[in-house]
Amino acid sequence: MTKEGMLSAAGRRFSRCAPSPRPRRNYALANIPPPAAVHIRTNDMISPEERRFLEAAELGNKPTLQECLDYDGDRRLNVNCLDSMGRTALEIAVDNENMEVVELLLQQPDIRIGNALLCAIREGVYRLVEVLVNHPNITREMLGDGWSQALDPSEAASAEYSSDISPVILAAQLNQFEILQMLIRKDASIEKPHRHSCICETCDRERLNDSLQYSLKRINTFRALASPAWMSLTSPDPILSAFKLSWDLQRLAFEEHEFKETYLQLSEQCKQYSCDLLSQCRSSEEVIAILNKDGNVNDDNIDVWASKLSLSRLKLAIKYEQKAFVSHPHCQQLLTSIWYEGIPYRQRSGTWANFFLYAFLLFLWPIFCLMYILMPKSRLGRLVRSPFMKFFYYSVSFATFLGLLTWATFEDYRYEKGERGGMTRASDRGPPATWVESLVFTWVIGMLWSEIKQLWEEGFKRYMRQWWNWLDFLMICLYLCTISIRLSAYYIFTYREDPYRYTVRTYWTSEEPMLVAEALFAVGNVFSFARIIYLFQTNPYLGPLQISLGCMLVDVAKFCFIFVLIISSFSIGLAQLYWYYDPNTDVCLPGATCKHSSNVFSSIADSYLTLLWSLFSITKPEDTDVVENHKITQWVGQGMFIMYHCTSIIVLLNMLIAMMSHSFQIINDHADLEWKFHRTKLWMAHFDEGSSLPPPFNIIVTPKSLIYVMNCLFNTVRWLLGKYTYQKNRNRATIRRPGYSRKRNEMEKSGGHDDDSLKPLTYADIITRLVARFIHQTKKDMKMDGVNEDDLHEIKQDISSLRYELRDDRRREIVRSSSHIDAVKRDIMRTMSTTSRRPYGGSMRLPKTRPSVAEESEEDDKSDETSSTDEEADETRSRKSSVLYIPPVNSTLPGIISEEAPVKKSTKRRASEADSKLPDRPLSDTYTSSFTPKLLPVFAQPPHSALRKTDTSMSFPINGTALDTSIVKPPRGVLRASQENLPAVELIETLKKEMNEKLDRLISGISENVKSPSPASHSHVGFNVEK
């Protein structure tokens, strides 16, 4: 079938098809390609002039670039043209770090700089950024918040950076310290975004306009604010700024779930920055200044040398959960020094020495406490007041309390006689307290007073943030309820005659006060023994396990929420299925004996208990059977019971195990960090002064307490009279500084602060040092990263640009040297012809048909400048007209091209370093084998011949004899020989003879080169031979 027939058949089939609601064009039949889905700019869309312009910018070819900019054709070149990747020539030059090309492009009036400035900041070249920022097109507003409004629409659609990334934001994100500091000096700033729930007009407009763009703008801004460079250069207190910003970002991670990982990464970046600053501390004084800073008081210039510490910054770090900062070795070293203050040899002692020390302190515990009550300011009192001793004696006191609870639990009441003979104590409905219970009551009162003091000192919010305080609160409440009920029962049955006071417990009701009190006491004992786990945090082996247990309890709580939903659904379903079958009645079937029903799902409460105990295999499978012949009920009940077991045991319990394993693995991976953080929280509770005595000694009224009470009453009276103001700041300095006495003695012996190491330090001075060290360390780490792909690309671009520069310099040097030597040769020949015509006496003025040597050189330079673009023509001309000039051995001609020629500025190049070498041919007899070609100077200014017409005389000696100006005084432009000066005429004759010999040799050499040409002579410089 022919092509026309196939097309007609296809057309008929197409016409029989059902009409489409949206007709489509058949590109296959029309042989027309479908339109492109994505329009990508290719090299075919770029004009030849623009392509040449962009390639010159890419390769660093400055002459070609200048030629493209100077070209004035039919259509002016667009300096903002784009390549296939959407980059302008300025962006390409900045990306290649070609400063000369950038300066050349910036001279153009309509150049666009926007994205090029961002590229320069990305490359981190300070000089490029400085040149671009100082351009008139860049204003102060464009560097900060006004960047997106000032951008050109074509630049705003850049494929690399969005319009909301300003130069200062990009410099901060990349941690370019020098560039960011330069932008800050030009008043560039970053505005912190509003909170996520802000309902202002600006936020609502941006959110409704484009919610994604609004969120990305916030993230880019927070990336800049969270950068170490921005916080180091703009914040007076970088550590406090890092704490607050980290906390805000952590809250945003749970508010904007879509970008949770991004915000968490930025939060970790802020935490790491604060740790890096703390790592720069080099002495304990600097660490103390950092940890003792109070963010609520402007005390940057207050002396950090103080006998008391508050550790306000450390408390703030614990509040903001800066675990890495708190667990830092510098911080832990200071805390350890404070913790063991007064017991300096404890850390360096062995195991047995510490054991005997603890035993000694244990047995002297009551004596030390009583001595502290009597003499709180003595040396022994200071020892008892130390943090370690307070914790140790609190642990001893709590262990004693647990021992009393155990004793009270195992006390046998059933065989003790009551107040009335014949009745046991167990049957007394209002028994009095025993001496063990009285001691427990005393301990509970002491623990209650300790918690009240802690609540007063820390504040309600800080007290409630610690979960162990919740446990203490519940434990004390249970014991107080037990004591209250016991006292009430004793009062009721002691002061009121009741014949049923001594009754066997079998006849007691469930609401009996003693039964309620014993139940509460039992629960309180459970919490009391669980409280001892809190003390494990000081141990490096048990501490991580205790922390893992706390995380697992959170997982159990999550599991219980899901498990309650599952067990409730099955309990309600089974109760609905078995509600009719009462387990308390016997069922009698016809022709069978009566059977007792064992229905365990008759109510919702029974269903809950049955399903709960079934997890531990206590229930039986027969519990779903019924006595009646109701198979459908029995089958459905068995199916639901099986589904419950599969869901709860196979799925939920294994999920709980996996969750607990995951939590334990997280803690185990960061065991040291988590343990040190929680240990620090325990230590901080014992650092502050107060609560020095453990229960029950803390309820004893001491003389110090009486003085404090009287002082408080006196201040209250003064406050009522308006003569006293209470300070609301709770972060008062109460912690003793380790080694302060020794340091103070050293300062007194040194006679003041002459020594720099003993001078008082302020927080502002120390934070300035730390920031400077951090910046230096960061830059050092960046330099040690090694060579990457970008560095290799930059080296390649530098080599390419240098190659073009060397090629241009070489071409100019060849043309300039050739023209200069030709002019020298013509001057010499003109001089010889003049002297041959009038050898004796008189003078003859030559017709000035050619310019002088200097003028010829200047004209040659001008011609070189105009013809520099045509490289091949210059090389061809130099190849045809140049030979290497080698002077003879016995020649006394001055060093026209020698190294000793006086020049102002020259760049020397050996003739042998040209593109090709000399041809291997034998030299003439007049040449010597030890001869080395002279270096050819490149004159910075228009060159002049060493042998030239001057206003005075010849500037070189001839045969070792210099011409005196008194002998030869030619006028300007004329070579004169006087008849009276015969020695001068003889010298000219000698010069003429030597020149003739030299020309003969040159002609012979040129003839040999013509007969056997070699490519190696193309780059040699010599006299041009005119045929």
Swiss-Prot record:
Q: Where is the composition biased (Polar residues)?
A: 1008-1017
Provide ranges: composition bias, Basic and acidic residues. 910-923
What residue spans carry the Acidic residues bias annotation?
855-874
Q: Does the keyword Cytoplasm apply?
A: no
> Can the keyword Nucleotide-binding be found in this entry's annotation?
no
Record key words, sorted: ANK repeat, Ion channel, Ion transport, Membrane, Repeat, Transmembrane, Transmembrane helix, Transport
Repeat region (ANK), residues: 85-115, 117-141, 163-192
> What highest taxon heads this organism's lineage?
Eukaryota
Q: Which GO terms describe its biological process?
A: calcium ion transmembrane transport; regulation of cytosolic calcium ion concentration; single fertilization
Give the subcellular location: Membrane
According to the record, the segments passing through the membrane are: 355-375, 391-411, 473-493, 516-536, 559-579, 640-660
Topology with respect to the bilayer: Multi-pass membrane protein
Q: Where is this region: Disordered?
A: 1-22, 825-929, 1008-1027
Summarizing the function annotation, the protein's role is:
Could mediate calcium entry and form a calcium permeant channel.
> Which family does the UniProt entry place this protein in?
Belongs to the transient receptor (TC 1.A.4) family. STrpC subfamily.
Query: Mind telling me what this protein is named?
Result: Transient-receptor-potential-like protein
Q: Which organism is it from?
A: Caenorhabditis elegans
Organism placement in taxonomy:
Eukaryota, Metazoa, Ecdysozoa, Nematoda, Chromadorea
Q: What is the gene name?
A: trp-1
